[in-house]
């Protein structure tokens, strides 16, 4: 009798994706983040669903409904903080996942990479809209500042912003539509993630050496299922430490003040995971230029496969590129720090230098270093 998991139409898909999937035998813990992102997404959808049962998307009651969730709903505070800090864990995993792709040359799988970029944009949009929902001071002013950036688009900008707002300012209509979008987008992300996986399984996984591993594959289960469970347990440990010991560590105290259109907070800043892009935006004195730089800070990832000049795939055996990669990581950490600082000397200059360095490393230094390494191999 044939095994049902290999013959049943639905079980067969699951089997070929998670059980009998031929996987390179040498992939490291850096390959855990795909499954961790899947776990984060499911966690966010579930906690978000329970929050949506008690939340009201009305400017008059949104803030108090979140307070009600934390005070009166059974374990509401756990659900709320798991959702808020779950978003932070999601972005940590995302950044590490993208970093892994850059380091090991996974971007040569262009379909998988491009779907990944679309996923990154979608997750960022979802997180931004979710941040608006508690209707605190930073929610309101964050929404006002970020949506207002669209007014930099020539000719249609102002009309576009008012169309998104549903009026002449961020108000009830804006909050209601942001809630609707915030609810639907995770399911779109789920569909995109399935497509991401579909394209990945067309080519098979990359591995640390960057050398094709068709001659040395092992089944995904039990080897990598157990490895992924270990990663998931570590993720759960970090998340629950955050939720139970310092739930507001990554949040903004201003968001515990109800939204007030008449009172601007001293420093308007987004959640920590957007600070690097926010710093790039602020480092350009021109509004349209800043918006373009902001979009390009993520969209630059789409150009990277075209700039791959090395004869090797990953950076495992390329010391010059490795140095540049870790310089890029340090630069992004610097940008994240600058994004949270007020716009004054010396932060302005540091931000501008870090922004220039970010684009220079990705677009100039890395391709040049690869050419140098190719020539060094000839010696």
Swiss-Prot record:
Matching Pfam families: Cytochrom_B_C (PF00032), Cytochrome_B (PF00033)
Q: What does this protein do?
A: Component of the ubiquinol-cytochrome c reductase complex (complex III or cytochrome b-c1 complex) that is part of the mitochondrial respiratory chain. The b-c1 complex mediates electron transfer from ubiquinol to cytochrome c. Contributes to the generation of a proton gradient across the mitochondrial membrane that is then used for ATP synthesis.
Q: Anything else of interest in the record?
A: Heme 1 (or BL or b562) is low-potential and absorbs at about 562 nm, and heme 2 (or BH or b566) is high-potential and absorbs at about 566 nm.
What gene codes for this chain? MT-CYB
Q: Name one GO molecular function term.
A: metal ion binding
Indicate where this protein resides in the cell: Mitochondrion inner membrane
User: How does the record classify its membrane topology?
Assistant: Multi-pass membrane protein
Q: Which UniProt keywords apply?
A: Electron transport, Heme, Iron, Membrane, Metal-binding, Mitochondrion, Mitochondrion inner membrane, Respiratory chain, Transmembrane, Transmembrane helix, Transport, Ubiquinone
Q: What's the protein here called?
A: Cytochrome b
Q: Where does heme b b562 bind?
A: 83, 182
Entry note: cofactor: Binds 2 heme b groups non-covalently.
Give the binding site residues for a ubiquinone. Answer: 201
Q: Give the similarity note.
A: Belongs to the cytochrome b family.
> Do you know which CDD domains this protein is assigned to?
cytochrome_b_C (cd00290), Cytochrome_b_N (cd00284)
GO cellular component, as recorded:
mitochondrial inner membrane; respiratory chain complex III
Where, in this chain's numbering, is heme b b566 bound? 97, 196
**Subunit record text:** The cytochrome bc1 complex contains 11 subunits: 3 respiratory subunits (MT-CYB, CYC1 and UQCRFS1), 2 core proteins (UQCRC1 and UQCRC2) and 6 low-molecular weight proteins (UQCRH/QCR6, UQCRB/QCR7, UQCRQ/QCR8, UQCR10/QCR9, UQCR11/QCR10 and a cleavage product of UQCRFS1). This cytochrome bc1 complex then forms a dimer.
Q: Which cofactor does it need?
A: heme b
- Give the GO biological process terms: mitochondrial electron transport, ubiquinol to cytochrome c
| TM region(s), chain numbering | 33-53, 77-98, 113-133, 178-198, 226-246, 288-308, 320-340, 347-367
- Whose protein is this, by species? Gulo gulo (Wolverine)
* PANTHER family per the UniProt record, alphabetical: CYTOCHROME B
